[in-house]
Swiss-Prot record:
This protein's GO CC annotations: virion component
UniProt-listed Gene3D superfamilies: 5'-nuclease
The keyword GTP-binding is annotated on this UniProt entry: no
The protein's name: Virion host shutoff protein
Ranges of biased composition (kind: Acidic residues): 327-344
Highest rank taxon of the organism: Viruses
EC number: 3.1.27.-
Alphabetical GO biological process terms: symbiont-mediated degradation of host mRNA; symbiont-mediated suppression of host gene expression
UniProt KW keywords: Decay of host mRNAs by virus, Endonuclease, Eukaryotic host gene expression shutoff by virus, Host gene expression shutoff by virus, Host mRNA suppression by virus, Host-virus interaction, Hydrolase, Nuclease, RNA-binding, Virion
Organism of provenance: Equine herpesvirus 1 (strain Ab4p)
Compositional bias of kind Basic and acidic residues: 309-326
């Protein structure tokens, strides 16, 4: 789920940091919660520890109570997000799974492949992409009001899995009660986003890049590909956190390079035979070119041809300056960077910075992180941001060669989708990025009690759960107050480090 092999790479290179909570008492950190991803993880842990049978609704209520208690202890303020809206009955029109479904559902139409691509050789089939490709530059804002839901609470679409032995498919595993979860969120008074036509990943990315939430609680690593910072687990006292800027600086690449090259590792876009691991992409990008220049260009493990047809793609470990591609470095041993950049042939219509292969081996032994990259981290009141992510995102599409195979079409459409999410609208001299609307209903504990009484089969367990929520879960603060306390800051306190 996410980027195949990214967590292994992050842990092996010590990119997962265990940070302490830095906010003072009374100041809560707003985070987005990928609801179903987190709930499935908690229910799996709870099911492994319990030694007595419980129905699915009771297990769901206990896990949700544990989640809220942990969030309170860590001073986290949750904003809940789910696929296809909070009720799970919407129809996703954007995102990785929607792109795969729309592209593969028909042989013709906007941006789809001809029937020849579905027979014979998979890797080198030519096609023409329709110029009238669906434009997703403006994310839709439609939401489903509660009054439009009658029976409601459709089971949300789950992540594509490569194994049939997942925990929820095992015999005797308790089923997640979606209706119970949604009703508890609403009646306890917690905020949520009800975007019916978006995946949870896209909603979380929108909340993150509009400076609504500081981080995202999920185990789905494709949010790193969208430039976000994620919390992997809130149970430890110092929650493990993976930041996109740490991955970029460790690899020594810009965000547009990271997006265009590592999109091959996205598990929702690729089937197992075309899916590449993060380690294989790193090895292929930093390997020296073939000695025989006249030989055909080699394929990557996922079947991708090299982006530049005449020479192999090489990214050095040295960090490139994000805002000035033609600037030279300050170090005397890197004076060769002022030479003219190599580009692909003019007929291809795209180019990017290349480094000679002889320099690549030398640069590998140098530290991957650089002072220039670290100096661009923007420290805010209680958190930090990395502006080069949004600055370099529009260059991603320029870097990509015209697609020739169906999985390259999926990659290009997904990159276009991510770029559209990260690119602000220009209105005169202003750059505007619209945040998805957040809903917060008034707290009503009578409805919480009714929900537990109606959905939990054992009345004694329902009464016990109601007492737990009543005694230990306070009424949440208005989310606008939390956002103002966390993000609002005087100009003299915002600094570059």
């Amino acid at each position: 789920m996410g980027l195949f092999g990214l967590l292994k790479y992050a842990y092996s290179n010590r990119l997962v940091k265990h940070d302490a909570i830095t906010t003072p008492p009374g100041i809560m950190t707003p985070i987005a919660i990928d609801l179903w991803n987190v709930m499935y993880t908690l229910m799996e842990k709870f099911d492994q520890e319990r030694n007595f049978p419980l129905d699915g609704a009771a297990v769901t209520a206990r896990c949700f109570f544990s989640l809220l208690r942990l969030l309170l202890k860590r001073s986290y303020y949750p904003i809940f997000v789910s696929d296809r809206g909070i009720y799970g009955d919407g129809r996703v029109k954007q995102g990785a799974k929607a792109i795969v479904s729309q592209t593969m559902s028909s042989y013709g139409g906007s941006g789809r492949l001809s029937s020849a691509c579905f027979t014979g050789d998979e890797h080198d089939t030519e096609f023409q992409e329709d110029p009238e490709e669906n434009d997703v530059s403006v994310p839709p804002q439609d939401t489903c009001p509660p009054t439009e839901i009658s029976a409601g609470y459709v089971e949300p679409e789950r992540k594509c899995e490569h194994s049939s032995t997942r925990w929820s498919a095992l015999d005797g595993a308790p089923r997640l009660s979606y209706r119970l979860c949604v009703n508890l969120i609403r009646h306890l008074g917690y905020p949520y986003v009800n975007a019916c036509n978006l995946e949870a990943d896209d909603v979380c990315a929108n909340l993150y890049h509009t400076n609504t939430v500081a981080q995202i609680y999920t185990t789905d690593t494709d949010l790193i590909l969208m430039g976000c910072d994620i919390i992997l687990d809130i149970m430890p006292l110092f929650p493990p956190t993976l930041r996109c800027c740490d991955v970029l600086m460790d690899l020594g690449v810009t965000y547009d390079e990271f997006l265009t090259e590592f999109v091959r590792c996205h598990t929702d876009l690729h089937e197992p035979q075309t899916l590449a691991s993060v380690q294989s992409v790193i090895s292929s990008l930093h390997s020296p070119p073939d000695e025989d220049e006249g030989a055909d260009m080699p394929q990557t493990p996922s079947g991708h041809s090299w982006r530049c047809p005449n020479e192999r793609r090489v990214i050095s470990w040295r960090r490139q300056d994000d805002h000035d591609y033609d600037s030279s470095t300050e170090d005397s041993d890197q004076s060769d960077s002022s030479e003219e950049e190599e580009e692909c042939p003019a007929g291809k219509g795209f180019g990017y910075r290349e480094n000679p292969a002889v320099e690549t081996c030398k640069r590998r032994t140098r530290p991957r992180r650089s002072a220039e990259a670290s100096g661009r981290i923007l420290h805010l009141k209680y958190t930090s941001r990395y502006p080069p992510i949004m600055e370099s995102a529009p260059r991603a599409l320029v870097r990509m060669a015209p697609p020739k195979t169906r999985h390259e079409v999926l990659e290009r459409k997904f990159v276009k989708h991510v770029v559209s999410m990260l690119t602000p609208e220009r209105r005169g001299s202003l750059s505007i990025m619209r945040r998805l609307p957040i809903t917060q209903e008034p707290s009503n504990f009578s409805l919480v009690h009714d929900t537990l009484k109606n959905l939990v089969s054992e009345h004694e367990i329902a009464r016990e759960l109601a007492n737990m929520f009543w005694n230990h879960i306070p009424t949440p603060t208005d989310y606008n107050t939390v956002l103002v306390n966390y993000w609002d800051d005087c100009g003299h306190r915002r600094q570059w480090s």
